[in-house]
Amino acid sequence: MQTEQPPKESQTENTVSEPQEKALRTVFDDKINFNLKHPLARPWTLWFLMPPTPGLEWNELQKNIITFNSVEEFWGIHNNINPASSLPIKSDYSFFREGVRPEWEDVHNKTGGKWAFQNKGRGGNALDEMWLTTVLAAIGETLDPTGQEVMGVVINMRKGFYRLAVWTKSCNNREVLMEIGTRFKQVLNLPRSETIEFSAHEDSSKSGSTRAKTRMSV
């Protein structure tokens, strides 16, 4: 007497087919052909400030380059722009929250200030590394314990020196601002002997210089 054999379990029921396995690729698996994105908490915009150009006002020199909202998009941008250490004299890179211009007069910045670290020379690879870690800390939301204060980060390339800065929304919330300054200094991996300083945009605007009086230091 023949007995009926139970149906064989399909080998595909509990396994993922090869095409499916290859369907989801992150930037960590394939730096070129990734298709799975890791979203950021908010969109960010890359700005480039051109060196002074005859016939152009200052705000016309500030160029909105691109807005992005994922880790993968950031790396795509970072890997296709010139390093910070090669910026022309009197030019800047800025990464700011979408909708915020890297200007003192912007409504999101006018009552705020900035933490800044300044050093001689062009910085080379060390500067590029500090700038990258600063940008990653900003867009990764690890500089700001509240998630509300940090508006953006800036690298200024000037004759004989460079400046890295974190711009904040306010200038009076001392406890939070000191925490941001402490974290910024840690991100830069500075020794205790080095100091970073906080100044208010209002003071800079009145003096007509980015080197306004220091309100706090770490």
Curated annotation (Swiss-Prot):
This is Eukaryotic translation initiation factor 4E-1. Residues 1-11 have a biased composition (Basic and acidic residues). Belongs to the eukaryotic initiation factor 4E family. Residues 1-20, 198-218 are annotated as: Disordered. Recognizes and binds the 7-methylguanosine-containing mRNA cap during an early step in the initiation of protein synthesis and facilitates ribosome binding by inducing the unwinding of the mRNAs secondary structures. Pfam families: IF4E. Keywords: Initiation factor, Protein biosynthesis, RNA-binding, Translation regulation. It comes from the Eukaryota. GO terms for biological process: cytoplasmic translational initiation; nuclear-transcribed mRNA catabolic process, nonsense-mediated decay; regulation of translation; translational initiation. One of its GO terms (molecular function) is translation initiation factor activity. GO terms for cellular component: cytoplasmic stress granule; cytosol; eukaryotic translation initiation factor 4F complex. PANTHER family: EUKARYOTIC TRANSLATION INITIATION FACTOR 4E RELATED, EUKARYOTIC TRANSLATION INITIATION FACTOR 4E-1. Residues 206-218 have a biased composition (Polar residues). InterPro entries: TIF_eIF4e-like, TIF_eIF_4E, TIF_eIF_4E_CS. The gene is tif451. eIF4F is a multi-subunit complex, the composition of which varies with external and internal environmental conditions. It is composed of at least eIF4A, eIF4E and eIF4G. eIF4E is also known to interact with other partners.
